Amino acid sequence: LNPVFTVGSQLIEAILLHTDKNKKEAWARAVEMLTLVGVNEPESRLKQYPHELSGGMRQRVMIAMALACNPRLLIADEPTTALDVTIQAQILKLMNDLKKEKGTSILFITHDLGVINEMADDVAVMYCGQVVEKAPVRSIFGDNSYLHPYTEGLLYSIPRLDTPTGIRLEAIPGAVPHPLDLPKGCKFAPRCKYATDKCREMEPELNEVEPGHMVRCFYPKKGERN
């Protein structure tokens, strides 16, 4: 949100640009959308500036703005970053409800695996700008049927309540390479404990190894790895 313009002027601008509504109709639509996303006293909020709203309230305004023109696809890039756990839960519930009520598809871009597990139907894991694994979310989180070593590393690095005391988390070694100095072959090979000479020389393609499950790896089956 632009800090020098009121919430209303920014929300109405989007409606006027993308619909044939006049200013009065756009104002009414803005009030309707703020009500839909759970903002109390919507007409008063439209006259306020972003700094006068809480972080969670500003997030709701952004969602209202994104949905005001009835899009078929909502792209949510880190929608819960910097929000406390309570507000995060409210925002996720709101987006889930809107998805069901409006039939809007949501593309989540996030590093929060908990959000993915809760919200997604399908998940695409990316590394160095490439999709390295794509599968139904239940395969990754529910059945532990993940196949790519990077996905494995992400999941192993999450603290678990049932982990015995004294067991250290299995962090992924190394660091993500600079985008202007990417390694030859598989981009994850320098950090992969299963990498072979083939991985370091050749770049794997994204292949479907099971129905609905794609992976970019020469050794997608765990039994094939050293």
Cite the ranges covered by each PLM segment.
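ABC-type ATPase nucleotide-binding domains, specifically the catalytic core motifs of the NBD
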Residues: 5-25, 35, 39-40, 135
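Conserved ABC ATPase "signature" region
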Residues: 24-44, 152-156
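Interfacial catalytic loop of ABC nucleotide-binding domains
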Residues: 44-49, 167
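Conserved ABC ATPase signature
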Residues: 48-53, 57
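A short, proline-enriched helix->beta-strand linker immediately N-terminal to the Walker B motif
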Residues: 68-72
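P-loop NTP-binding/switch modules centered on Walker-like glycine-rich loops
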Residues: 75, 79, 83, 87-167
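Charged, flexible cofactor/metal-binding loops and thiol motifs
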Residues: 137-226
